[in-house]
């Protein structure tokens, strides 16, 4: 879980770079976004590993925030699964272009990493897309349903 200051910064960056799908962020409060956002990496990874990956790839954090919200709202269809992963790749390229100049090698590193992460999600994430969300909001809702 992230703090609201980090989420505010990521929200700002998503707006600044006009990332695809950024409208999904407006559905939630910053507190809820902080509960939904788990950093870069799947829920199955331990939090320390997601933290390390996120620290190594900070420019992809606003892309991952949108992606996490899409996965939070998963409709469990293959079309939306594919679109979410393709959007991650496109948004990563947008961020890379916006943050780094043409001659800066980091531009191409970030773009490549976004593409790779999107491919990992495509090839390894279908099961997670089809299972219930594990964010604190969804866990609380399931607990309330269970206990009436």
What are these regions (language model features)?
Residues 1-148:
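Extended terminal accessory/targeting regions
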